[in-house]
Amino acid sequence: MTASSNFTNQFLIAMPGLEDPNFFHSVTYICEHNEQGAMGIVINQPTDLTLKTVLEHMDIESDAKAAEIPVFHGGPVQTDRGFVLHSPAGAWSSSMPVSEGVQVTTSRDILEAMARHEGPKDVLVALGYAGWGAGQLEQEIADNAWLTTPADLDILFRLPPDQRWQAAAARLGVDLSLISGDAGHA
């Protein structure tokens, strides 16, 4: 992997032909990418769960506002493990900065703060993550499974989930509805 092919803080946009149900029409935010592989969170597949449901399961008291925060299917790996993508704010016990504008946290303290309305302004809560072994992501990109573009905080945190796939591709000037699912190499 060269420095120019590091996809940390990038969106991975599934091509229309990618039919794996875990990634069909997905946008994945890449949290870490190095010579050992990559880790990301799918940001446009909300589940039927809300933050309130997760907090209740963890015996953390919350109010009705937590029922308004969706929980996303972050990927097929460790689907019982929670991840919070958020704007940098607070000092959580298990945070990893991804970029100047985004951190990922896996500790209970951020959820407790969110239940008290003391958490970060921008959040995306997910269960599970997407993972790739060494060289796997690079090969999938070379095989036309994915497009990549620098992450955008509005798409990540504010745009409705059902608009994120097209919006991320539009950052590249691509209209995914015009691309065949059978794309290949010329």
Swiss-Prot record:
Pfam families: DUF179 (PF02622). Coiled coil: none annotated. GO terms for cellular component: cytosol. InterPro entries: AlgH-like. PANTHER family: UNCHARACTERIZED PROTEIN YQGE, UPF0301 PROTEIN YQGE. Belongs to the UPF0301 (AlgH) family. This is UPF0301 protein Tgr7_2910. It comes from Thioalkalivibrio sulfidiphilus (strain HL-EbGR7).
